[in-house]
């Protein structure tokens, strides 16, 4: 396939994917709505024939059916791509004595009718297919059951926790660091440790079965009281949850200087726990799952448990006899709505947490995105893990397809499956006015800005403009599909922070360049000031003076 001769829509010009003659099209088969997209060949395929990857530029709606159509595609020799005989059979309306072929005719005709109604001429099609997105129940039913069971359990049990460590002045901006564990029922098998799946009543659960309560286990936590609370004992601290990065730990709250700085600058008491499923405890199971993809349900299930663990920690922070009532915290004052702040994986998982939590309505997502299936092939973090995967799956084509298929499970355990339920269509038991502030590092080597833009469009977020300085974007319209935010606006917002890193490559490959800006936005004091205004006043503040937002390079 020749991508240029085929005029494949590129992420640099998403508007072109909506043109009447676009070579690759996605439509909602019920409404006829065109979906913005880009299409590209896998850039690191080696000697194998490259895959054509079609990437919607906005989240598809739960339970909706869509059709993908391709036309005017050219080979590298300049010839038209020849449709398969099977596709021609249906497109051209043939019949057969083979009932296996005729069995699909009704469904194919419905798809062709939908495409024709959307202005896609049937005779021009080289390939088309339709599919239905997983339902909201399929994506969220399990975690909502786990959440509700867990909160019911907390409501009927006196909080049980153990303080295992008290470190006064652990850092110069920390008054006291308190670590420990709290009791919580798991919905996983056994003791809920890495590698466990959801527990069900049946040993052979059906698609509609829901997880059940299992053992009561110890969940780790750490909290840090900022120094401002002892410098001025009248200070009332805001309660906040923090979410750590890739395969990390709750102790990022301590070694992450940005978290301590935000706590000190904005009067926040942050607590954290592990993202069970993708924490330091899960590295071994992640390796096993990459070597044997049939093990991946253990990752997706435990991620959902990890989200609920975070919800439970937040509830125990705001309970009169909960964790913060312990003498280890001294005579501090904590009040206000629970907020969330997380970076990298914490930004990705934070989208899911925000959607599912009954207590969080404001979240700051640092270097965030959704959809690991899109992220991994564009992340330097995946280089090492792909090398682990390669012996079992030596074909890059197979690995790329497998990652895309895994996303159907991953959607239940990361932001991708919940993105349609943060700013609209709220999930049962959650608040109605949720909003997030997304801080994106321009040219990020680890979390692609392309996936962040997809998330922002899906949220209906506004974007700060100018997005970047002239000449610093490959897009025809930087921030395409997003309305501009103005100072004082409420609602969800995405802000690009540019520290001068190289722009991301056009193809499906990780960025290069000497500097990875991944940590730059969070280390910028003005960026943190914007975070605080959003979290605690509910408004967007222009801290960049109407100019592109720039950050100093970390380190």
Cite the ranges covered by each PLM segment.
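Acidic, low-complexity Ser/Thr/Gly/Pro-rich repeat segments typical of extracellular/periplasmic
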Residues: 1-185, 189-193
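Short, solvent-exposed loop/turn and secondary-structure capping segments
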Residues: 7-13, 36-39, 65-69, 76-87, ...
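A conserved hydrophobic secondary-structure block that centers on an alpha-helix together
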Residues: 44-71, 75-76, 214-259
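Domain-level recognition of soluble alpha/beta enzyme cores
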Residues: 159-233
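Cap/lid segment of the alpha/beta-hydrolase catalytic domain
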Residues: 192-218, 231-329
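Loop/turn elements at helix/coil->beta-strand transitions in domains of secreted/extracellular proteins
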Residues: 235-239, 266-269, 335-337, 358-362, ...
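C-terminal subdomain of alpha/beta-hydrolase-fold enzymes, centered on the catalytic histidine
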Residues: 302-305, 361-555
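Primarily recognizes the serine-hydrolase "nucleophile elbow" in alpha/beta-hydrolase
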Residues: 316, 324-377
